[in-house]
Amino acid sequence: MSQSKGTVVLAYSGGLDTSCILVWLKEQGFDVIAYLANIGQNEDFEEARKKAVNLGAKKVYIEDIRQQFVEEYIWPAVQANAIYEDRYLLGTSLARPCIAKKQVEIAKKEAAEYVSHGATGKGNDQIRFELTCYSLYPEVKIIAPWRMPEFYNRFRGRSDLMEYAKKHNISVPVTPKSPWSMDENLMHISYEGGILENPKNHAPPGLYLKTKDPATSPDEPDILEIEFKKGVPVKVTNTKNKTQHSSSLALFCYLNEVAGKHGVGRIDIVENRFIGMKSRGIYETPAGTILYQAHLDIEAFTMDREMRKIKQQLSQRFAEQIYNGFWYSPECEFVRSCISKSQEMVEGKVLVSVLKGQVYVLGREAPHSLYNEELVSMDVQGDYDPADACGFIKINAVRLKEYHRLQKNKK
């Protein structure tokens, strides 16, 4: 028997690609530890465990990291109102460093010098996985089969993988594969590739799995009261049926359920990948969409104007850092700490209506709001002297007068 080349921890999904990669790694002489993260996807984890063992995995780890995902990754994104290129709420981007962190922990525990993944050589995920691994385990060696000529020249498409699976008794679904790829976690589901690569093609009606079609969703709204402390949601109450959740995971799952029922969170976009190409993606982010709108509202209600301008600039940088895979970079740690500081007084309750694919803010209250009802009232003068506005306007007009004087002289 030939000597092992070493131990590799494979980020395993149980699907065709990573099942073939598991067997291929064994062919190359590696001992393989399969690691499957429960990050909120719809998966038969015990069946995946049995499959990995049958394929020859030396050991199988199935790790439930859903709560860690919510509290350590999703909540900072909610605090930041993190959104990439104005539309994408970063579901996959947030999940990858969370998954890879646990993969590194397992590799260290098992004294494995290699980690591996099934991400393609054209996408963002390879970057997110590997930058996390190198940050947390600098001496690690990474095996990325879809970047290795000996692998991608051998497996040029799904038919080659299917043939290899048949040869090695790798069980594959008997139903035809959807003509697109899908990635699911607690935050969202993404769909891309296949027929969706033509940006003109409409999403087929049967594509969406997390959200109901808004056109056929309920005609009556759910009214939710969402409570925030330091910019983090701490309680949700359905005012109609009095359902209430305050634990992070249960709260997020409940928002997914309500938003999904009403068709909230669908987007179809073309985005810029970090490696330089544009790609078309369709996303369902139900709970994330509700929290984005609710947090945006309570933050505007409680935060100083100039402070919020700076925070918005940081939020854009934060979204780019997450998308590009730099969660564990010094600049991202710095931005996260600044955003966390900005949230100290972001506390209160937001009332939202969820209906027909939309989230409507109905009202808000906060113990430390900068909103002064008497000061802003049209009916009460309060401490504000309207005459003071004259000087304010004249000072601000100086610059405009000078600009237009210059424009006039140019003619």
Curated annotation (Swiss-Prot):
Which positions are annotated as binding L-citrulline?
Answer: Y88, S93, N124, R128, S181, S190, E271, Y283
Q: Which InterPro entries match?
A: Arginosuc_syn_C (IPR048268), Arginosuc_syn_N (IPR048267), Arginosuc_synth (IPR001518), Arginosuc_synth_CS (IPR018223), Arginosuc_synth_type_1_subfam (IPR023434), AS_cat/multimer_dom_body (IPR024074), Rossmann-like_a/b/a_fold (IPR014729)
Query: Superkingdom of this entry's organism?
Result: Eukaryota
Q: Which GO terms describe its cellular component?
A: cytoplasm; cytosol
Q: Which UniProt keywords apply?
A: Amino-acid biosynthesis, Arginine biosynthesis, ATP-binding, Cytoplasm, Ligase, Nucleotide-binding, Phosphoprotein, Urea cycle
First and last residue of the signal peptide: none
Q: Name one GO biological process term.
A: urea cycle
Q: Does the keyword Lipid metabolism apply?
A: no
- Annotated EC: 6.3.4.5
- Reaction(s) this enzyme catalyzes, per UniProt: L-citrulline + L-aspartate + ATP = 2-(N(omega)-L-arginino)succinate + AMP + diphosphate + H(+)
Q: Binding residues for L-aspartate, per the UniProt record?
A: T120, N124, D125
Q: Which residues bind ATP?
A: 11-19, 37, 116-124
Instruction: Give the location in the cell.
Output: Cytoplasm, Cytosol
Q: What's this protein's function? A: One of the enzymes of the urea cycle, the metabolic pathway transforming neurotoxic amonia produced by protein catabolism into inocuous urea in the liver of ureotelic animals. Catalyzes the formation of arginosuccinate from aspartate, citrulline and ATP and together with ASL it is responsible for the biosynthesis of arginine in most body tissues.
Assembly, per entry: Homotetramer.
Query: What is the similarity comment for this entry?
Result: Belongs to the argininosuccinate synthase family.
Q: Which HAMAP family match?
A: Arg_succ_synth_type1
Q: Which PANTHER family does the annotation name? A: ARGININOSUCCINATE SYNTHASE
Output this protein's name: Argininosuccinate synthase
**Organism in which the protein naturally occurs:** Xenopus laevis (African clawed frog)
Taxonomic lineage of this organism?
Eukaryota, Metazoa, Chordata, Craniata, Vertebrata
